């Protein structure tokens, strides 16, 4: 997969995406990430990328022309037309289902907003999907772009050592992850649940499922109501 990030602060994205699992995935060729400086596509001698908004109002808006130039150059470099995403507080909130959907693309362009946003016409012209990471406002779209890239990259074959690594994590199957423990088995009077120490894999699997349901019911009742439960689980958790 190739992900192109169009931003005013490419170093901000590169510094994070060169580290840890994503950095190794890039080094091994499982993922290609290209960060593009939007000012390189700016207008005039001063490479201008923003202007005042029509109709008045405070703040500056990213212009359509530089963004379009960046998009066109990236599109020319890819065999399959990229799916284009704009990180925006008014977009659909990113969740694991959307991450799975995005991971099916061969190429993705991620546009990072700044100032008061971007000219609406460029979003319409390129059929851009708007995605948010939550109901709050950030200074720019760089951190959301990194979050999206990280989440999508983890779904790609070879990025993680084993498929089970992400299949058992929170949100992958719609539930939150069960509690986990490591050595020592006793710490400050708190014991690791005995079932995890007996080596009985079926019992461990059942315990983890029960704990995952309990955690989800308590912390995210909205997710719990959507989860697929067996008849036995419905009775145990009082769900119809």
What is each PLM-predicted segment?
Residues 49-70:
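Short, structured active-site "lid" loops
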Residues 1, 184-240:
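SAM-dependent methyltransferases
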Residues 63-114, 119, 157:
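S-adenosyl-L-methionine/SAH cofactor-binding core of RNA-modifying enzymes
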Residues 143, 155-194:
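Internal, active-site/partner-interface "lid" segment
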Residues 2-40:
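Glycine-rich, flexible N-terminal cofactor/catalytic loop recognition
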Residues 35-56:
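Short, surface-exposed acidic-centric catalytic microdomains
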Residues 118, 122-169:
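Structured adenosyl-cofactor binding patch, chiefly the S-adenosyl-L-methionine
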Residues 4-6, 34-36, 85, 108-109, ...:
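Hydrophobic/aromatic beta-strand patches that form the interior of the parallel beta-sheet core
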């Amino acid at each position: 997969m190739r992900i192109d990030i169009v931003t005013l602060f490419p170093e901000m994205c590169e510094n994070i995406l060169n580290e840890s699992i994503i950095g190794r995935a890039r080094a091994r060729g499982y993922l290609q990430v290209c960060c593009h400086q939007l000012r390189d596509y700016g207008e005039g001698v001063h490479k201008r990328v923003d202007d005042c908004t029509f109709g008045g109002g405070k703040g500056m808006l990213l212009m359509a022309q530089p963004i379009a130039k960046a998009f066109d150059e990236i599109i020319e470099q890819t065999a399959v037309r990229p799916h284009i995403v704009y990180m925006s507080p008014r977009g659909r909130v990113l969740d694991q289902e959307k991450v799975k959907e995005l991971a099916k693309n061969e190429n993705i362009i991620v546009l990072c907003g700044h100032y008061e946003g971007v000219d609406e016409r460029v979003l319409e012209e390129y059929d851009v999907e708007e995605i948010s990471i939550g109901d709050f406002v950030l200074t720019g779209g760089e951190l959301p772009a990194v979050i999206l890239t990280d989440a999508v990259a983890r779904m790609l074959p070879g990025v993680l050592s084993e498929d089970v690594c992400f299949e058992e994590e929170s949100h992958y199957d719609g539930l939150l992850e069960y509690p986990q423990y490591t050595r020592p088995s006793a710490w400050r009077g708190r014991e690791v649940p005995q079932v995890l120490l007996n080596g009985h894999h079926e019992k461990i699997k059942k315990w983890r499922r029960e704990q995952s349901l309990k955690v989800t019911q308590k912390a995210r009742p909205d997710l719990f109501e959507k989860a697929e439960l067996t008849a036995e689980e419905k009775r145990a958790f009082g769900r119809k």
